[in-house]
């Protein structure tokens, strides 16, 4: 009978471990989903900012250093 009890205990322990692994797997899956959503949002923002930079018009006004001084100097 001891062998049968040992086997039952081992089965119960294995079932407990499997249950905890299933919980851990689900938690990891949820974390992965959360991170993927955050990554998608960041990629969308980066594309938006890249398009904004491409669309920015270059100013026709030169900076002070690039301006030639007036003729009376």
Curated annotation (Swiss-Prot):
The transmembrane segments are none
List the coiled-coil residues.
none
The record's listing under InterPro entries reads: SlyX
- Record-linked Pfam families: SlyX
**Superkingdom of source:** Bacteria
* Recorded family membership: Belongs to the SlyX family.
The name this protein goes by in its record:
Protein SlyX homolog
Give the source species. Answer: Actinobacillus pleuropneumoniae serotype 5b (strain L20)
